[in-house]
Every structure is written in structure tokens, then in C-alpha cells.
Amino acid sequence: MECIHKFLEEPGFLVNHHLDSFNQFVKQIPEIIKNQNPLTNLKNKDDKNVFRYACRLWVGTKTSSELVFGVPVFTENGVQKPLYPNDARLRNLTYYFSIHAKITFEIEIDGVVQEHTPEEMVFLGNFPIMLQSEICILHNVPPEVRFAMGECRSDPGGYFIIDGSEKVIICQEGRARNTICTTKKYSDKYYYSADIKSYSDDGVTFPRVAAVRIATKEDASSSVRTKDGVTLHEMVVELPDVRLPIPLFVVMRALGVLTDKQIIETCLLGENNFQEHFHESVCDAMGIYTQHHALEFIGSFTKYKSLQYAVHILVKLFLSHMGDQLIDKAFFLGHMVKKVLRMALGVDPVSDRDSFRMKRVEPSGVLLHDLFHDFYHKQLEHVGVEIDRAHNKNKNFFNEPANFPTLFLANYHQFFEERITEKGLITGFKGRWGATEYTQLVGVSQKLNRLSFNSAISHLRKCVLQLDDSAKVIAPRLLHSSQWGLFDPVDSDGADVGTHKQLSLCSRITDGFPKKRVLDVMAEYELLILPLHTLTVESATLVKLFLNGQWVGCIEEPEITLYTLVECRRTGILPSTTSISWNIGENTLYIYTDAGRLQRPLFYVNHKRKLSYSPERLGSWVDMTRGDIKKPCMIEYLDADESNSSLIGFDPLENFEKTLYTHVEIHGSSLLGFMGNQTIFVQHNPLPRNAFSCGQSRQAVSVYHTNYQNRMDTMGVVLNYGQTPLIQSNFLQPFKSLPCGANAIVAIMCYTGYNTEDAILFNRSSLERGMFNTSYFKTYEVSESNGDIPLVFQGSTNTDENGIVQMNTEVRPDTVLMRMAQGDSIKNIYPNRDQEGRVDRTF
């Protein structure tokens, strides 16, 4: 339990998954811009159909380092002032940072290249800041100082302020990248299927789906039938940007594997008991025996109908996570074929799509990264259109060699006037998340629920699976064993059970780091990797090495490799987010460094069969989870993939020498979430009681914000005399200043059947002393469309000369709150029905 206390002392522990991912996103903005540089524009063809002029445009110069991030400001009465988060709330502004960039032009005229970098920067746009992130003014500010700035002492941040409204980006649950998924009953023609969505490492190429399908027929006379009663026929491959499925052997020959024997060996790698199932596929590729003919065949089904475009598809679009080498893609395609064959013949089960081994969670930073990338790509396309439009307006002038540079140097500010990236992000926060109709998501950005402090934190820790309401599927709603320790098992969300989940207390979402770091460490420790092009039939017994879904090669000493890499992670040589697992059944070593993996902390049993935990090593949570050469970490994080190959004990033992345990749980409370840990004796209650406790505690009247007096919320309910519960969870200690109830002494009169469900008798003096006394706040807001109207409101005792009700005015149904004038007519704003009280504040 001491370790859990150390975790609770960490700043921002409730929303670190948002803060860390947003900080990572901001650091990656220069990389996003760099990957899409340069923008090339060609002009003025000569007689030989060759362009004489060319201009290459680099945003942020050639290194993308000339980017300036500006602080948030606003203008009042012509004076520019710094913008603080609470000012943004009160003034209905967006709390943002700006980006300015220098532009480098490389202008080529008849082979002569000149380079220009104007001093004046272009404005790329204003982009929302996550509160308490590294670029926020509240970052690392003490609670009392935050309180003086209008913030809550206990508010962890992790949300945005858009037009004065607090917005939260909900974590989205989705399929893992570069992961093969097998399926039965794919279609009437293709019963068995294996598909993969490939993402390139540089992020420049958009993700593409590739698939292997097996055609089947119901042939009762066949002696070779699967357990599903169907006969396997030809295998085909679905390629990106190719209209029809292509026979497997044609694709293999296009990738450079020519003979039937080589193709079968590439697929099976010595597992010869599946050879008979390739007969139909061999016949399906009759007449195409060379790489050239195979590329021509594939090209005929593309929009350009060319061999060159077929090469482009295979090199850049098909299995882009495998790099540019065609032979590597051939081996990976063979691996997919073998996987779908083993599934079809009942050797392996169908892929479990609901397992978190095959899922990732995208926090706010990852979602913003993808949205920024897509809209920035659109903005560059728009810049190209603007350049063409400016050129066509005065084509003869700009076609002169001396005038061509002025097309760019004199007009480059106009090219970036349309801030598509900024507008796209703001539109996403207001409901339409996604740059295209294919990437749009519903409900990603939502208004932060400020009904209570508990509801706000639960909203920030929610994870959503996008599922169509019309889909009558049950499996995604069930509690999956791979979710153990990653999600709260008792905090369900009513009708959205299973699709709306709450992160457990200590779980985190990985940020990701380049996989090259793992390869560098393996090279440094001389852990040999056999490249794919060196594999032979005899290599079937070697252990495959997959790194972020990419088949890197094979290794001869898996035990040594596994031990070395795990020790490197525990000693800080590799990041603690690295996942290393050896699946002996699949004869594969999986290593993951990508973002979006859910991890949870555990003690581990070291190679000496000693538990990593010892009271003498207690320190800060960061110190216990990060090790060095001299002192390995005491706690390590595991994801669902690594947990699948581990044996985890629930209680620490005195001696682990006679056990097979690899890890031990830290404490039972780490399995529950924010609300589950506030439920008392959760392990002794039936599930409905725990579920009701989580749901109803979120809706309890409370002090939702310690600085509610300085806010103008649309609606707010405050418990005036809240109390700390007599029986409380240790987890409640950091939030005692935000009570959500009162300690009531209840007597139940059960003698005659009169029960609490019938009625409650209150002690009058308790109510008079303030028991359950609450304050309800309602904000009325109007916008002034024209500030030049000289009318001064007079003749009303409630409103001032600006037409706004005065503070401390008693409010009744006929009280005028605001008076609005248009011409000679005046419109009065009255309170809603049955709302009475006093004016607390005007702004």
C-alpha cells in the first residue's frame, strides 16, 4: 500500500495520459511539418515538354527548426494583454498558442538554383493549449497560486478551453496498427481472410489495408475439407488502389519470388503439411511466370493502367510498415498466408478482436497529431492551388526569368492566409472530428462534465469504443480477461456498458518512441538478427522477431535476447514503455514501442528468484519505475501482450524459488478506477452495489470546484455544508476539500413495514442548521452585436446604464436581468420559470 501512496503523491496522476500525449504532440509538430516538406511547384514547359522553372518551398526552412510558438494573448481596448485560462472562460475566448514559421524558397530557372529565406515569418494559426501541459502557464504552478489565478486547487488539467467552454478529448479505443487479424465467414466467396492495416514509420504515407482471402466451395465429394465443411480453393491478395483481388502467385512473382517452389517455401518455411492447399493458387496464376508480366497484370487493374504505378503500389503502399524492400514484403505476405491457412484448417483459433493485445487506445495527443497531420496536408494542397491561381492571373509576366521569383517572394503571405489547419482543429473541437468523411469520428470532443468534481475526473479518464448503435453485438460489451488491471471492472456506464470504460487507477497509455532504439541496443549487445532475405527452409525452427508488427528477421538465441532486453528496460537503457514478450506457441518474439498501449505497474521476480520490492527502496513513484545500471527499477509496466506471456501472483510470497511466478500485483486497489477506489469495502459488496456507488457518486451534490465563485458556469450546484465521510477510502485523502455529501444519522423504523423506500422524516432543526443546504447557480448570457449604439438605459431600478442587472439584486420571475436595444425597440431578458434568488455576479 505504501507504493500506492507514493503514486497518489505524483502531480497530475489522474490525467497524465492526456498531459504526456499532448506534450508529445507539441514536440512532434516540427516533425509533422518536416515530413511534408518541400512543396514543389513546376511552371513553363518548353518544346520538349520539360518544365523550365521549379520552386521548392520549405516551411520552417530546410531543417523545420525556424518555428516560433507564441504565448496566448488577447486584445482589449487596442492593448494586447496576456491571456490566462480563467480569462478565456469569462471572455468566451480560446486558450491557444500560435505558430509562426520562416519560409525557404529554392527557385530553379533553366537549371540555375537560387535560395531565398525572407525574414518575415508566415502565420500558420492558433491552436488550443491543454491546461497544465508544458506550454500552459499553469504548468508546475503551486495550488495556492493557481487558486489566485481563478483555478481550482485540486484541478489536474487535461482539458481545453474553446470559446470559453471547457472541452475534453475522449480517449478512443481502436485496432492496433500493423497487426494481422484473421476472420471466418468474410463473404460468400471468400470464407477465410487475414487482413492488416499498415502504417509507415515516417507517417507520410496514409494507412492502407492489405488482405489475403481464400475462396471456398461446399464440395461434399472433396477429401480435403476444413472443419467448417468447406473446401479451400485459390488464394488472392487485395492490394491498395487495385480494383480486383490479385492471385497470390502473381503478387509473389511481382515481389520477386518467381518459381512455384520458392513461393510455397516463402509461405510455409518448412511446414510442408499445408502444401496440398496451394494447388488451386498455382493454377490461378497460369501464364504469368515473370516479374515483368506480373507487374503488368497488376497495373492493368489500377486507375493509371501502367506497370510503373504497380511498382509504386508495391514499394510505397503495400505493407508500408515493412519498408521498401520487395523481398521483405514477400516474406511477410507468406507469413499472412500461413496464418490464414492455420486458422482455416483449425490449427489456430480465429483472432480475438476484443483482446487488448490487438487494440490500442488513442489519447488526446495522438488524436490531435493525426488531425493536425491531415489538415496540414490539406493546407499545403491549398497553398499549391493559390500559387497556381496567382501565376495564372499574370502568366506572361511571371514566365519571364527575372520575374518568376517575385511570384513567391512578393505573395507568399497570401498563400498562407487561409488557415485550414487551425480551422480544422477548431471544427474538430466543436463536433466534426476528422479531415475527411472516411476519418470522421463522433463524440471525440465533448464539453467537460462539471456537475461534480468526481464527474469531471471520470470524464477525463473515460475511454470509448466507437460502436454503431444499430450493431447488435455482445462480445465488445463483455469484460475481457485482457482488460484485467487496465480498466475498472465495476464502474460500468449503464446502457453503454463495455463501450464506455474507465481507466484503472495506475494504468497508463504509452507515448511511443522510435523502434530504431531497440535495434541499436541489440546491435550494441551483439544480439544477432538474421535478415529475411537470408532465410531458408531450414530457418523454420528459428524464432521470428516482430518489432511494432514489422517482421525484422529471426534470432537464434531467444532466451538470451529476451533476458538482455528485459534487463535493459529495467536498468533504463530502454524506455520503461517497451513491451517484450516471447510467445513460445507461435515461436515469435514480439517487441512493441508504439503509442496507445495500455500498461499497468507490477512488482517482478528477478533472475535470482527474488521479489523486486523491498521497504528500504521506497521512494518517489518516478524513482521506483525508472532504473539505472547500478539499481534496476522496483516496479515495471506491462501491457496486455506481455501480461499474456507472464504468470502474475496476487500476493507477495516470502520465497519464489519453487514457483513459476514472473510478477506480483502491487495492491488490489490498483485494479480499480477513480470511482471504484472511493467505494468502501468494494471486495465485500455485490456488483450492483459497487456499480450504483460509482454512478451515483458522480451525480452527488458537492463542491464541484474550489474556485466556483470566480467562474461563470452555465449551471452549477454547490453543497454549502459538505462533510468528509466518517468512513472513507485512503484514495479520498487528496480531495478532502471537495466534499460530496453529509454524514446523516438515519433511524429505520421497520416494525410495521414502514421503510426508507416509502418516505423520510427529517429533523427540522437539522435542516434549519443547514443540512443538505445547496446553492444553485444559473448564468444568463447575451452578446452585443453592435457596440456603437449610443442608447443609455434609464428608468429601471434593477439595471445599470449598460442594461445589465446590478449585483445582489433580488431575482423574481418578473425581474429584468438584461435589456437589449435594436433601433428604438428594447428587449428584456427574464429569468426562467420558478427561478428565484439573488444576482451573485455580473461580468
Task: Provide a role label for each language-model segment.
Residues 175-177, 182-184, 504-505, 511-519, ...:
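Short, compositionally biased
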Residues 749-787:
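Carboxylate/His-rich catalytic cores and anion/metal-binding grooves
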Residues 154-175, 359, 477-514, 738-740, ...:
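Conserved phosphate/anionic-ligand binding catalytic regions in large, soluble enzymes, centered on
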Residues 163, 171, 428, 436-445, ...:
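Generic beta-strand/beta-sheet core signal
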Residues 138-148, 458-488, 720-735, 795-808, ...:
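Flexible, glycine/threonine-enriched loop-and-boundary segments that flank and lead into catalytic domains
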Residues 1-449, 464, 504-507, 511-688, ...:
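N-terminal non-catalytic structural scaffold regions of very large proteins
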Residues 143-144, 520, 782-798:
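Short, basic/aromatic beta-hairpin or loop at an interaction surface
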